[in-house]
Regions:
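P-loop NTP-binding module
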Residues: 1-269
């Protein structure tokens, strides 16, 4: 997976975009008519805001590597995680979800399972409402927590309020039942889990056992080779879809074994 990304300018700000805009974001994309006319989108969603950019093209390559594997069937449930909290896992998960949803026939459900430091809701400008935490702790029904996005075929399951016991919630039997339920109920779509680093949280390992494949995000110049190999050993080689490298300088690329590393430049978790 050779992928090139540059750091989006003013990544701390949100773009205000209207449905009648000429911005490339809406070119060839089916919008959700039920969502309000104005969207506040984080500039890090390069696959939507800059669909003709090198960054968006690299995400399309990442998507194609996953959707069209050399062997076997495509993984329908995908966990995106990282070695460290600031390696860019949410950036990769969100842009991968958009890229898949831009396909003609593909639908995507994106879950923010980082209950300690959630960010998916902020990226998509959907507000700070209830989500996974409330489902696990209060028994709120799943359909009422799913949030429609500006893309007709992309749905978000936000993290909700930060709980005092994230490890217990994500390792619970109710979480296991949730994964089984969404895989059964939404078998027609790809399901992407944005999860925290496994060496910091035990709950990520519980989720990894219930997904079809895993994408690991690392940081160039920071994550050590032995740390990556340790993650691969934890999850098992058969589960690893690929490893992507964030923050790399342009023109730098390398790989560990059969797992491809790309060239990213980005500065958010």
């Amino acid at each position: 997976m050779g992928n090139n990304f540059k750091a989006p300018e003013n990544s701390h700000q949100h773009n205000q975009i209207r449905k009648d805009t000429e911005n490339d974001f809406f070119s060839g994309i089916r919008l959700n008519p039920d969502v309000v006319e104005t969207y506040y989108i984080d500039p890090v969603l390069v696959t939507g805001l800059e669909p003709q950019s090198i960054e968006a093209e690299q995400f399309r390559q990442l998507k194609n590597n996953i959707l069209f594997p050399e062997k076997g069937t495509p993984p329908k449930s995908i966990m995106v995680t990282s070695f460290s909290p600031s390696d860019g896992k949410s950036f990769v998960a969100a842009n991968l979800a958009i890229s898949i949803a831009q396909n003609i026939d593909e639908y995507v459900l994106l879950l923010d399972c980082d209950l300690r430091s959630p960010s998916i809701h902020s990226m998509f400008g959907i507000g700070d409402g209830p989500g996974l935490c409330e489902y696990l702790s209060q028994g709120i029904q799943l359909p009422s927590l799913l949030v429609k996005t500006f893309l007709d075929k992309l749905t978000i399951f936000p993290a909700g309020k930060i709980p005092p016991n994230p490890a217990e919630l994500l390792s619970s039997d109710r979480m296991k039942r949730l994964i089984k339920e969404i895989r059964s109920r939404y078998s027609d779509r790809y399901i992407i889990f944005d999860t925290p680093p496994p060496h910091l949280t035990a709950e990520t390992n519980a989720i990894s056992r219930q997904v079809d494949g895993i994408v690991i995000v690392i940081q160039h110049g920071k994550t050590r080779k032995k740390d990556v190999l340790n993650l691969i050993d934890i999850y098992g080689k058969e589960k690893i879809l690929g490893v992507v490298c964030n923050f790399a300088r342009k023109g730098i690329g390398y790989g560990y074994g059969k797992y491809g590393y790309g060239k990213y430049g980005y500065g958010q978790k």
